[in-house]
Amino acid sequence: MAHSSDLALFRHRIAEALPSANVPTLLLLLYQFTGKEYWLTPPFLPVKSVWGDNDSGGLAAELQTEIRNAALDAIICWHSGAPVTKQDLSEEELIRMLTVSEAEPIPPEYADMMLHKLRRYAGAIPDPVSLPKGFRVLIIGAGMSGVAAAIRLRQLGISYIQVEKQDSTGGVWHAHHYPGCGVDTPGHLYSYTFASGNWSTFFPLQKEIDDYFNRVARDFGIESSIRYGTECLVTRYDEESLTWHSRLRLPNGTEETLVTNVVLSAVGGFTTPKWPNLSGLRNFDGPVVHTSKWDPEVALDGKRVAVIGNGASAMQVVPAIADRVGALTIFQRSRQWVAPFPKFQKPVPEPMQFLFREVPHYEWLYRLRLSWIYDSEVHEALQKDPAWPHPDRSVNAVNDRDREAYTQYIEGQLAGRPDLIAKVIPSYPPFGKRMLLDNGWYRTLLKPHVTLVDGAAARVEGRSIHAIDDETHEADLIIVASGYDTTRYLLPVEVIGRNGRTVRDVWDDDDCQAYLGTVVAGFPNFFMLYGPNTALGHRGSFIFTIESQIDYVLSVLRQMGEKRLVEVECRQDIYQHYNRKIQQMHQQMIWSHEGMSTFFRNDRGRIVTNSPWRLVDYWNLLKEADLDDYRTMPQVDSRLETSGVPREGVQRPGSRLRRRPS
């Protein structure tokens, strides 16, 4: 029981927070804390909003006040020791709650996944895994994927070694620090289910995100065991010992070979910068800096700056530097759809941070609502309607309404500048390329010293940049914002599987494929996170996707232990069937629209980055591994202590093994 003075202070802090709280989330909290149907019925039913997470619920001020006052009383009762009335929600209850809160029907098939998220928010961990003594996993990378993987393996007692080529965790968020660098997913979704972000802004910037991954690594006890400054150059499968031999470059420049039973790649997809094929760029008479390799010492103040590209990184860096430079010229190779960003750099008020931190049920329910808004509801609007009469501009009626809404937004932002409006509105459907958020882009285009060139740069001569229309623009500095090589997965690690074939051979360089985005036929005991066709082109929580893949890998390892298996390899027929299915699904979706180019496709036109699945369908595929999808090899000799790796890491002679037929 809280002391009266402590309770009074707590009540005061919560009362400060509630005027800023999300009303639809408070309705969920009230129902869960009190069990009263009253809060899920008229007149408290929220109205669907067009943009954002609908903080007011579209309700009248007096109804909002009643909800906030009731929430204060319910939270104080809970804080004083009252039990949560609806602690264990049924699937039907949760779907009804979300349907009310989101102001639209939530399909019942989402119930299991949503309950799973709530359990994970509350601290549930995966089922135990028991593996033979000496069994080891190599985790390559300690970015957001690698940190999550290491935490789960440590929690389940699985022996692992983790290498990271940088000097810290964080992956791309540690490596990339160009001005304006941040996330375009709400921070409360861009967080592990098991670790709250305690964000200071709703859409955090690079430094806070990097700090988050560092903090989580420390809090969960994995940070001290990461081998920093260690790069995996090559990992090769040895078919005799059924182990992976990984050649590592150590911080002092020497090399070491590490032998493990399993390799789990967490190298990420935004590691290799993509440079434009621009004649004369290397001979530019001034600094040239890529956003992925930003030089904090580069001089910007008063300079004539040219930006090559107008994608996600350009849309962040341009507004961030515009007021510092003397002149800013942006070369736009293709036009982009840009959505409103009402919470751009909007701080989470300190009282709200207190509410998120001290009333975890509120944070869990808030995150659950966001996961529908950003993970799920967009997917249907990306499907091609074969009967739709305007396939050039949109793919269905919903997509056409989106086009109209985004067009109106752009016209409003650039009112009075028909010349700019004509330059920026795309001809292809919204969501055909990566959807961008307006963090001051249009406001920046209106500045008198900013020029938007409607076309790519053609060549560079001295300090002159020639556009494709032969117009010349002078610059002191070139910023290359052309993105990353996203279609060549697993780079820069060389992965060599069965029969000495590299993954680049199997994929014909950039024709990357994987079963469930996680395993590749011909590469036994090898798993990857954020593999081909796992990116969420329809928005959503990339981190939840990664956690789901980790659960799948753990399911495979669990069954390896239970069935005493030393080798699992995805069957070729399963692998091929899945990837045919992926491409068939993509042909019915917006990303195969012919009216635009996109980094989602490789050079031969196949979509290799994006997932065609609804998140709930992909989660169900990953929930439990089916070893019928694999060729497996059991361990026969029960006297063996390990599955291929002696404690000293020295290769032992091959054992008597038998292979289960595919």
From Swiss-Prot:
Domain of life: Bacteria
GO MF entry, a single one: monooxygenase activity
Residues covered by region (Disordered): 638-662
Database matches in Pfam families: NAD_binding_8
Required co-factors: FAD
Keyword NADP among record annotations: yes
Keywords: FAD, Flavoprotein, Monooxygenase, NADP, Oxidoreductase, Plasmid
EC number: 1.14.13.-
Marked site: Transition state stabilizer: R434
Record Gene3D superfamilies: FAD/NAD(P)-binding domain
Positions with a binding annotation for FAD: S145, E164, W173, D184, Y190
Sequence similarity: Belongs to the FAD-binding monooxygenase family.
Protein name: Uncharacterized monooxygenase y4iD
Organism of provenance: Sinorhizobium fredii (strain NBRC 101917 / NGR234)
